[in-house]
């Protein structure tokens, strides 16, 4: 059930301490990329631990529409039989990417340098999000696009019949834009160069290299320079998807604010471009440790242990950390509510164009639950109420955003009074087992729809 279905109101209340192991789903970023790169390789790519949320399943359907064979063997085990770089067929129908900004932007890139036409749409939330940030660089390859006003979905992309390689400096830190350009560069002759002034998550670069693409990454004075040689033959891979750090954030943060809690979250991907939240929590004084660090599939992995942390202090989050934790600011702001002192989060303008305007959405919901929040265009601050000091008792609007809904469910686990959201249905897009997993740890989340 996602943002285009019947609303599911939910309420979370303080229950017992949270105890046990939380096995969160596979990483969303790596799941999308595994399916897309598998479809562009020649032969069978085997994937285990795939996140089977709605967003990723929409990407799997899209790869089938472009001619790849995608097989679900059950238990998170999947196969993709790829058609090779430049081998995409023209889809017969509109590609519906649901709630997934990652899915639609990466797929647009992957097809933009093939001589085919495809039309993309999404749910009410996705159809409000800006796509020009992707279609502008794709136009440099020779692709054409026609969409609604402001570069929004539904949108038709006419791929370039004779693509040219591109040198592109990404104007705002965005792994989605960078990845779309790199995927487009796969089917352009010559070298495509992407320059990032601020490093973002690097799963695409790591995975492209793993699939056999010729790609180099160099840190220079002008930023991170990524060079990709076009028209390789990608070789199929066996991929074990690490567990998603953005999903791990919820049981971790819930344990920190719920008295008596001790939770282990095993097998979490700790790619340095994704782990900013955990370092920030440690800076605040959280009892959070990394156990059994190891490398799996080229990605750093560890088990996270989080315990109730009544001594957390508000801090100024370094703005340069923003790209490595952009999806985690909503739940960080909940933890900040239970700290002592003020937490300042700056350099976060990107939050205003996520699934919702996340600064606005969190500020409204926090205030409804007795927390003082200030905000500017690219910053916001949360005044901590101290451990067990958050009143709660309010209802937050989720704005069709899975992370907003889950963040307020976490808040209810530590607040004095129950916390509600108007619609928890979007949670299924990234974390379909959220309610069950948190309930197994001892949380009380109930659906209140009659």
Swiss-Prot record:
UniProt-annotated location(s):
Cytoplasm
Q: Which NCBIfam families match?
A: aroA (TIGR01356)
The active site consists of: 327 (proton acceptor)
InterPro entries, per the entry: Enolpyruvate_Tfrase_dom (IPR001986), Enolpyruvate_Tfrase_sf (IPR036968), EPSP_synthase (IPR006264), EPSP_synthase_CS (IPR023193), RNA3'P_cycl/enolpyr_Trfase_a/b (IPR013792)
How is the subunit organization of this protein annotated in UniProt? Monomer.
Supply the EC number(s): 2.5.1.19
How would you classify this enzyme at the top EC level? transferase
Region spans: Disordered:
1-26
Upper lineage: Bacteria, Pseudomonadati, Pseudomonadota, Alphaproteobacteria, Rhodobacterales
Q: Where does 3-phosphoshikimate bind?
A: 28-29, 33, 174, 176, 327, 354
Q: What is this protein called?
A: 3-phosphoshikimate 1-carboxyvinyltransferase
Q: Does the keyword Amino-acid biosynthesis apply?
A: yes
- Give one GO biological process term: aromatic amino acid family biosynthetic process
Reactions that this protein is recorded to catalyse? 3-phosphoshikimate + phosphoenolpyruvate = 5-O-(1-carboxyvinyl)-3-phosphoshikimate + phosphate
User: Which pathway features in its UniProt record?
Assistant: Metabolic intermediate biosynthesis; chorismate biosynthesis; chorismate from D-erythrose 4-phosphate and phosphoenolpyruvate: step 6/7
- Name the keywords, alphabetized: Amino-acid biosynthesis, Aromatic amino acid biosynthesis, Cytoplasm, Transferase
Q: Which organism is it from?
A: Ruegeria sp. (strain TM1040) (Silicibacter sp.)
């Amino acid at each position: 059930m996602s943002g285009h279905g019947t609303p599911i109101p939910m309420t979370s209340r303080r229950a017992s301490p949270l105890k046990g192991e939380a096995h969160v789903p596979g990483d969303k970023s790596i799941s999308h990329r595994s399916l897309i790169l598998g479809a562009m390789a020649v032969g069978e790519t085997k994937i285990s631990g795939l996140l089977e949320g709605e967003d990723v399943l929409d990407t799997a359907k899209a790869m089938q529409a472009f001619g790849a064979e995608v097989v679900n063997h059950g238990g998170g085990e999947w196969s993709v039989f790829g058609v090779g770089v430049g081998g995409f067929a023209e889809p017969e129908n509109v590609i519906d990417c649901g709630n997934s900004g990652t899915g639609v932007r990466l797929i647009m890139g992957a097809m933009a340098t093939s001589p085919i036409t495809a039309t993309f749409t999404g749910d009410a939330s996705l159809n409000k999000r800006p796509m020009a940030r992707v279609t502008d660089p794709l136009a440099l390859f020779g692709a054409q696009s026609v969409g609604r006003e402001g570069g929004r979905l539904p949108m038709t992309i006419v791929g370039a019949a004779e693509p040219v390689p591109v040198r592109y400096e990404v104007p705002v830190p965005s792994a989605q834009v960078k990845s779309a350009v790199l995927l487009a560069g796969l089917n352009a002759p010559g070298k495509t160069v992407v320059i990032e002034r601020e490093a973002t998550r690097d799963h695409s670069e790591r995975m492209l290299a793993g699939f056999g693409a010729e790609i180099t990454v160099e840190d220079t004075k002008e930023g991170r320079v990524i060079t990709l040689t076009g028209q390789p033959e990608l070789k199929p891979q066996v991929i074990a998807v690490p567990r998603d750090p953005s999903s791990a954030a919820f049981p971790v943060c819930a344990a920190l604010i719920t008295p008596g809690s001790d939770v282990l979250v095993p097998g979490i991907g700790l790619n340095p471009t994704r782990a900013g939240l955990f370092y920030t929590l440690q800076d605040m004084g959280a009892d959070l440790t990394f156990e059994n660090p190891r490398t799996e599939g080229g990605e750093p992995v560890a088990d996270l242990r989080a315990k109730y942390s009544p001594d957390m202090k508000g801090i100024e989050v370094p703005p340069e950390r923003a790209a490595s934790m952009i999806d985690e600011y909503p739940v960080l702001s909940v933890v900040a509510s239970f700290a002592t002192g003020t937490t300042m989060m700056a350099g976060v303008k990107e939050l205003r164009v996520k699934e919702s305007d996340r600064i606005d959405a969190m500020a409204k919901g926090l205030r409804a639950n007795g927390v003082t929040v200030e905000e500017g265009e690219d910053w916001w601050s949360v005044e901590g109420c101290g451990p067990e000091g958050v009143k709660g008792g309010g209802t937050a609007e989720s704005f069709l955003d899975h992370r907003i809904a889950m963040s307020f469910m976490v808040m209810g686990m530590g607040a004095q009074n129950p916390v509600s959201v108007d619609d928890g249905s979007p949670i299924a897009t990234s974390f379909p087992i959220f309610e069950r997993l948190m309930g197994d740890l001892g949380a009380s989340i109930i659906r209140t729809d009659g």
